[in-house]
Amino acid sequence: MSSADSTPPWLTLVGIGEDGYPGLGKQARRALLQASRIVGAARQLELLPPCIGAARETWPTPFSLEPLLARRGQPTCVLASGDPMLFGVGASLARQLPATELRVLPAPSSLSLAAARLGWALQEVACLSLVARPLAALQAQVHDGRRLLVLSNDGDSPAAIARLLNARGFGASRLSVLEHLGGPLERRLDGLAGDWSLPRAADLNLVAVECRAGAGAVRLPLTPGLADEAYRHDGQLTKRDVRAVTLARLAPCPGELLWDVGAGCGSIGIEWMRAHPSCRAIAIEANDERQEHIRHNRDALGVPTLHLVAGSAPEALLELPEPDAIFIGGGVTAEGVLETCWERLRPGGRLLANAVTLQSERVLLDWQQRLGGDLTRLGVAHARPLGGFDTWRQALPITLLELRKPAARKPPRDA
């Protein structure tokens, strides 16, 4: 065990609330009084009294950490809203700097203050931020009976949230807009999404949502295998039952990256990302119309950060980051596709390919004989009317090849 670095951190993050300097603790005040340079948003810097003599700098527009990091090692204070490590600049800095270079002095977050005002148990609430993020990210969080705390991007966010809820059939949901939490201008506005009439709130606001589904609400469960009707497509869709099996075989885990090669309408990548907020996916699709379907579906189903690559495999794969899993829903007979996918797959990763035609089945059988893996055939039948009776209507059988790339061997220990 090594001792911690004794060098004091050069960067101090001070969380500040709407109550400004008087609301800070002793450590935070001392840090600001001793600082030679303070960086923050103009609104936050204006909360400091004249006794703080440090040079003050606002963040550049558009926002960037580069000017701050260019002075790495020079003692600096950064002002942040509430808890800097909760949807704040602290989280961004922590991804680029080791913990030994940071000292964080948090204040109560607006999420904590909102939970206190509403009497909600914070650990039972879904918390998310729309600050510089697409509104569509909210779609994956809307479920009957669920409570949400949403950090707004600006004063237009509450009305936009109400419109989204209405479009999903959640007009009965109760909204509470909490403005300037913790400050002298604090205000609360309540109403139903279906009756929301406030055109614009204060820019600094948080929206609390109690989700209530109406009779026509669109239900989007978290398990794989969403209804086929949830997708806009031209027929190039991995059908619901096969999709559920495919996702189970791909086995998404937090933080993992998927390539969806020949993505069609994007269903596999979308449901991969819905498995956990940190899951990532890249959809590779050459057809222009299907690319539009992917853009629509990723927003409608709450994963707007799904990355779409317009192009054909294998050429479109060459510059992409290495994936933890790959799904090939079409194109296994195209020259070089399987070879490139297998080469780029991380050690220990999973590759799953589906085939319908005899030609594509032959390719999968050849790969299975060379590399092993699981070869499975799925047959799905649905009851359909036939005259005055019902009969089973068989869908085209699907052949699945599941391969796992051997993990990299650890070097032997020295004797």
Curated annotation (Swiss-Prot):
Protein origin, superkingdom: Bacteria
Protein's pathway: Cofactor biosynthesis; adenosylcobalamin biosynthesis; cob(II)yrinate a,c-diamide from precorrin-2 (aerobic route): step 7/10
UniProt catalytic activity: precorrin-6B + 2 S-adenosyl-L-methionine = precorrin-8X + 2 S-adenosyl-L-homocysteine + CO2 + 3 H(+)
Keyword Cytoplasm among UniProt keywords: no
Gene Ontology BP terms: cobalamin biosynthetic process; methylation
EC number(s) on file: 2.1.1.132
Entry keywords, A to Z: Cobalamin biosynthesis, Methyltransferase, S-adenosyl-L-methionine, Transferase
UniProt entry tagged with the keyword S-adenosyl-L-methionine: yes
Entry GO MF terms: precorrin-6Y C5,15-methyltransferase (decarboxylating) activity; protein methyltransferase activity
EC class: transferase
Protein family membership: Belongs to the precorrin methyltransferase family.
Name of the featured protein: Precorrin-6Y C(5,15)-methyltransferase [decarboxylating]
Organism placement in taxonomy: Bacteria, Pseudomonadati, Pseudomonadota, Gammaproteobacteria, Pseudomonadales
